[in-house]
Amino acid sequence: SRGLGDVYKRQALFFDPAADTFTLRQWFLDRPTEEKEMLVSFFTFLSDVKRLVHFNGTTFDLPYLTHKALFYQMEDPLSSIASLDLYQALRPFQSILGLSSMKQKNVEQYLSFPRKDQLNGKQLILVYHDYLQTLDEKKLELLFLHNYEDVLGMGSVLELLALPALFHGDFSVQSCRFTGQALEVSLQPEREVPVFLSRVCADGSLTAFGSRVSLSLQTHTAEL
């Protein structure tokens, strides 16, 4: 995230093979004059990363970090790292999910992810600058809480990748029968669908949850 031009915080959740556990690491800019040093540390960390998973980083975060690398005449590690943008991957399924917005907090709420942080990015910039003036530990806690829950929340959002996998054909057909008016198909997805989905349209219906997906396609007869 940034505050009036400065990258003031970065965070990453990564698997540590040595410890056999996931570790959350945060970088925080408590002195704006040390922005370059923080970026050097963050980019050094990325040098061993094979893939980035983020939420809507394609639109802002990644281009902004690339801009900062150019500004400080640093090597940009992002260009050589594979990237998965959860927002871009899930946005086509907004209507199926029945969501009015695909903001991360909206998706998390849909998935019943428990979140304490209630601040948005613009509010956090003000909190950050207040912290620089006051060094109030409570404001610092708010900043770290937001980052912490942003990263953990993506863990729950990841489960929704079952939807693009399903629509890309990652399933096996369990049964298929014709009732005379509709074609009833039962599918088993490769990834379990984490939420109950039920959608109906003029040409059929779809229900999905867990390891079961049911598809009903209405048939039409006509004379040539």
What are these regions (language model features)?
Residues 9-14:
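Basic, amphipathic juxtamembrane/active-site segments
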Residues 3-8:
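Short, small-residue-biased leader/transition segments that mark boundaries at the very start
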Residues 15-224:
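DEDD superfamily 3′-5′ metal-dependent exonuclease/proofreading module
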